[in-house]
């Protein structure tokens, strides 16, 4: 494969395609109304530069120093950034459709101001930014990006279900709307029970509420036996039985006496196992910080 000829950035005044820009430094450089297609920028420095109405279509930036650059109406559709420094950048009306970031120092707030309007593209960009934040050890930013991603997913799912525009009415019908409803319910339950893994305290609170709920059901509708004798169900006893059932510890001296009580115990035990999985996952996320 022939080696690409290296070019200098200032020499481009209108457009460039399939060009290689490498090992060049242009601080305070100003460029306007230029289109770059499938170009590669390697170790290019543009500190405090001003770029206005530029198009970077499917370009690759590797180890570039773009700190303090002011981007105005710059389109990065399909571009990839690897190990670049984009701290303190300012981005006004920029486009990041299908853009990807890996191991970059970023000004996340500026990029979030330029999220694509299409939900699927916005979610894709947020996933890439979140992976970048995890790679760089920015766990708090990664959690914030996850929350933003889930909010957009829920908004899009609601549109798929209710079809507020002709686009959604044409593309989501019958089974598709039902599947979207199930996805939305799953996200809502995940957020309610444990905040999508971001809020451990909510997990404990919801577990306590479930234990109390099942204790109330045992008190009014369930019956247990001990040594072949029916146990008088008061709330403290029901709360104890609910706790040992939810935590899957069990108690060898007590056993359900009716089919309905058996079903309640089995269902609560399943919920306890599910909650244990949630707890392990949430603690792992917390300790991995």
For the regions a language model picked out, list residue spans one by one.
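Tandem repeat scaffolds
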Residues: 1-146, 153, 162
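Hydrophobic, aromatic-rich alpha-helical transmembrane segments
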Residues: 125, 177, 192, 196-200, ...
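Cytosolic-side membrane-insertion boundary helix
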Residues: 156-208
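An amphipathic alpha-helical interaction surface
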Residues: 187, 216-219, 253
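Residue-level signal for the membrane-embedded core of alpha-helical transmembrane segments
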Residues: 204, 208, 212, 271-278
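Outer-pore turret/helix-boundary of cation channels
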Residues: 205-238, 260
């Amino acid at each position: 494969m022939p080696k690409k000829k290296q070019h200098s950035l200032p020499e481009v005044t209108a457009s460039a395609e399939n060009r290689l820009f490498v090992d060049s430094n242009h601080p305070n450089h100003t460029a306007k109304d230029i289109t770059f297609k499938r170009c590669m920028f390697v170790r290019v420095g543009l500190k405090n530069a001003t770029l206005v109405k530029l198009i970077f279509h499917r370009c690759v930036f590797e180890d570039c120093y773009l700190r303090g650059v002011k981007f105005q109406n710059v389109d990065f559709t399909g571009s990839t950034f690897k190990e670049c420094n984009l701290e303190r950048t300012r981005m006004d009306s920029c486009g990041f459709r299908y853009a990807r970031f890996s191991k970059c120092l970023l000004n996340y707030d500026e990029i979030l101001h330029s999220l694509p309007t299409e939900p699927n593209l916005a979610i894709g960009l947020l996933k890439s930014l979140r992976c970048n934040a995890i790679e760089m050890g920015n766990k708090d930013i990664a959690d914030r990006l996850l929350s933003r991603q889930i909010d957009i997913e829920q908004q899009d799912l609601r549109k798929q279900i209710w079809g507020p525009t002709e686009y959604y009415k044409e593309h989501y019908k019958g089974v598709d709307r039902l599947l979207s409803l199930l996805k939305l319910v799953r996200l809502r339950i995940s957020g309610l029970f444990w905040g999508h893994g971001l809020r451990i305290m909510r997990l404990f609170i919801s577990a306590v509420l479930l234990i109390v709920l099942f204790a109330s059901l045992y008190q009014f509708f369930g019956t247990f036996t001990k040594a072949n004798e029916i146990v008088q169900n008061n709330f403290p006893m029901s709360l104890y039985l609910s706790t040992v059932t939810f935590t899957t510890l069990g108690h060898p001296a007590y056993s359900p006496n009716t089919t309905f009580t058996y079903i309640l115990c089995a269902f609560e035990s399943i919920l306890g196992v599910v909650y244990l999985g949630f707890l392990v996952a949430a603690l792992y996320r917390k300790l991995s910080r």
